[in-house]
Amino acid sequence: VIAAMAGPAAPPVAGFVESAFNPLVHQAVERCLTAHPGDGSRTAMVLASTMGDATTLDLGSRRLVAGQVHNPLLFMQSTANAILGQLSRDFAVTGPLLCLSTVADLAGELLSTTELLLTDKELDRVVLIGVELAGTGRTTAAYRELRTIGPPAEDRAVALVIDRDDPHPHPRPPYGTPPTAYGTLRGLVELAARIQGTDRP
């Protein structure tokens, strides 16, 4: 199992504008797949996020309300499939690409999906990605309405690569981390820290 994280300093990705969401995903996955290259035809990628790319959605909505010309790049990147498509091209990944949303901790949902995908004998490994942006007024209100953990304190993405023969990791309760530190990424951040050998985020 390989793990990597990306934070607010993630470098930009050509063709993606304004939002940190896609650069975060790209950097975390790039770090994993560079450290652990493999057969892209037998690799799946699964991305999970509670709020998705709220920056792009909010910016596009504000421009629409203001009567401004719509930016086609914002339309293109408004779904998380866009950055998965970019990564599949960069790393020749031709297996399934999936995007999920859950209001609970993302780790359990991603690991359950990985187990299901690896029942397919044509797949050998799965790249798991969790990503959340720091809260805005709108998303913080949405988290309250959903009665879920809430947004992370800063933009963050976590990626793991799990091979078929790896012992499948299991999340465990975080080490007293304040809920606002990592939001719905808490389980993934703690799991990545264990895999990296630091045992603490």
Across the structure, where does each feature detected by a protein language model lie?
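Conserved "HGTGT" condensation-loop signature of ketosynthase/thiolase-family condensing enzymes
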Residues: 1-74, 78-108, 112, 116-120, ...
